[in-house]
Amino acid sequence: MRYDHIEEGDPEIFELMRRESLRQNRTLDLIASENLASEAVLEATGSIFTNKYAEGYPNARYYGGCEVADQVEILAIERAKKLFDADHANVQPHSGSQANQAVYLAFLKPGDTILSMSLAAGGHLSHGAPVSMTGKWFNIVHYGVDPKTETIDLNEVEKLALEHKPKLIIAGASAYPRFIDFQGFREIADKVGAIFMVDMAHIAGLVAAGVHPSPVPFADVVTTTTHKTLRGPRGGLILCKAEHAKAIDKAVFPGVQGGPLVHIIAAKAVAFKEDSEPSFKEYSAQVVKNAKTMAETFASKGVRVVTGGTDNHLMLLDVTSVGLTGKEAEELLAEVGIVVNKNAIPFDKLPPRVASGIRIGTPNITTRGLRDEECKLLAEQMSELFITKSEKVKAEIKGLVQELTERYPAYKGWS
């Protein structure tokens, strides 16, 4: 892609864009929540729809001139519904967190009880962490994971639900590598008369491709981001049963947002079309295969993998098992051109800014074209670096990263 107008009119921003392009192309990104949007998605994101204000919904706008914007939003809605086999879709949320806020507004009043996964166990800030708006406005009860298996214990979830009678039960996480029993959660929600919400932001692409169980048949409402495994623009999406459609739409607008971002909705529509192609199913299957390969390799080399493996696109490594903190491991990998994030692990004794683990994901490198054989080699060398911390191994991995990034560029023609 060319940026002639930016280069001419704002050389400072152009230089930063050039540097970011170099960074993305010359490093391997193993951050589980990041991916590479297609150039078609990027074009839509920067399209002329940026200029259009469109408060309201298709055929019910508060501004004139929305005839084409209506068609864009309708197309995005229909594509999302078909992709996930959902009754209703709202494509206006600006982010996953705002999608979650809209759900809370639709079903709850301040002080109502939410039962959700704790941040420490792998949940998300927006599900009721004390520092978040959700944690301040609602009564939050958290479930965690079993100390031995490090997986969700539905018996604990049911016990807490029966004790606290939540109005809303949330399943979904930001750092959980295993399948979630959505049907089991549904049964618990029914026992206490709770709304059941799933935040599938991390796994949405895998769900769309059919390589991960779908929460849509079981949940009253499902939220997600549209980037991550969906490879779309940064944004949010809400899916729900038909009976909740009016409440959800009213909560999004005028509840938590004003005008939608029509250019982002156009980019979402482009991504949803891409996600419906057979090639996306192949890609998503490879994402999971790559993640399983890396997790198995780390474990075989003596790096402890939280829960013992993965069922999706991510894994958590307990790097204290090789004498590192998460912060140290993140910095060590950055030196050789591998990008990860430090991450707390269940029952972590270290503070979040240090952490005992790192989170690793395969969506980005799989989009570039890496397959299980390269992922195995990468995990082997990363493990050796964790254990030896030697300059010789650093040099070897730098060479591997250079070889892989040149063989599999993030964007062809970009450098």
Curated annotation (Swiss-Prot):
<comment type="similarity">
    <text>Belongs to the SHMT family.</text>
</comment>
<dbReference type="GO" id="GO:0035999">
    <property type="term" value="P:tetrahydrofolate interconversion"/>
</dbReference>
<feature type="modified residue" description="N6-(pyridoxal phosphate)lysine">
    <location>
        <position position="228"/>
    </location>
</feature>
<dbReference type="Pfam" id="PF00464">
    <property type="entry name" value="SHMT"/>
</dbReference>
<dbReference type="GO" id="GO:0005829">
    <property type="term" value="C:cytosol"/>
</dbReference>
<dbReference type="InterPro" id="IPR019798">
    <property type="entry name" value="Ser_HO-MeTrfase_PLP_BS"/>
</dbReference>
<keyword id="KW-0554">One-carbon metabolism</keyword>
<dbReference type="InterPro" id="IPR039429">
    <property type="entry name" value="SHMT-like_dom"/>
</dbReference>
<comment type="pathway">
    <text>One-carbon metabolism; tetrahydrofolate interconversion.</text>
</comment>
<keyword id="KW-0663">Pyridoxal phosphate</keyword>
<protein>
    <recommendedName>
        <fullName>Serine hydroxymethyltransferase</fullName>
        <ecNumber>2.1.2.1</ecNumber>
    </recommendedName>
</protein>
<dbReference type="GO" id="GO:0004372">
    <property type="term" value="F:glycine hydroxymethyltransferase activity"/>
</dbReference>
<feature type="binding site">
    <location>
        <begin position="123"/>
        <end position="125"/>
    </location>
    <ligand>
        <name>(6S)-5,6,7,8-tetrahydrofolate</name>
    </ligand>
</feature>
<feature type="site" description="Plays an important role in substrate specificity">
    <location>
        <position position="227"/>
    </location>
</feature>
<comment type="pathway">
    <text>Amino-acid biosynthesis; glycine biosynthesis; glycine from L-serine: step 1/1.</text>
</comment>
<dbReference type="InterPro" id="IPR015421">
    <property type="entry name" value="PyrdxlP-dep_Trfase_major"/>
</dbReference>
<comment type="subunit">
    <text>Homodimer.</text>
</comment>
<dbReference type="InterPro" id="IPR001085">
    <property type="entry name" value="Ser_HO-MeTrfase"/>
</dbReference>
<dbReference type="GO" id="GO:0030170">
    <property type="term" value="F:pyridoxal phosphate binding"/>
</dbReference>
<keyword id="KW-0808">Transferase</keyword>
<keyword id="KW-0963">Cytoplasm</keyword>
<dbReference type="InterPro" id="IPR015424">
    <property type="entry name" value="PyrdxlP-dep_Trfase"/>
</dbReference>
<dbReference type="InterPro" id="IPR015422">
    <property type="entry name" value="PyrdxlP-dep_Trfase_small"/>
</dbReference>
<keyword id="KW-0028">Amino-acid biosynthesis</keyword>
<dbReference type="GO" id="GO:0019264">
    <property type="term" value="P:glycine biosynthetic process from serine"/>
</dbReference>
<dbReference type="InterPro" id="IPR049943">
    <property type="entry name" value="Ser_HO-MeTrfase-like"/>
</dbReference>
<feature type="binding site">
    <location>
        <position position="119"/>
    </location>
    <ligand>
        <name>(6S)-5,6,7,8-tetrahydrofolate</name>
    </ligand>
</feature>
<comment type="function">
    <text>Catalyzes the reversible interconversion of serine and glycine with tetrahydrofolate (THF) serving as the one-carbon carrier. This reaction serves as the major source of one-carbon groups required for the biosynthesis of purines, thymidylate, methionine, and other important biomolecules. Also exhibits THF-independent aldolase activity toward beta-hydroxyamino acids, producing glycine and aldehydes, via a retro-aldol mechanism.</text>
</comment>
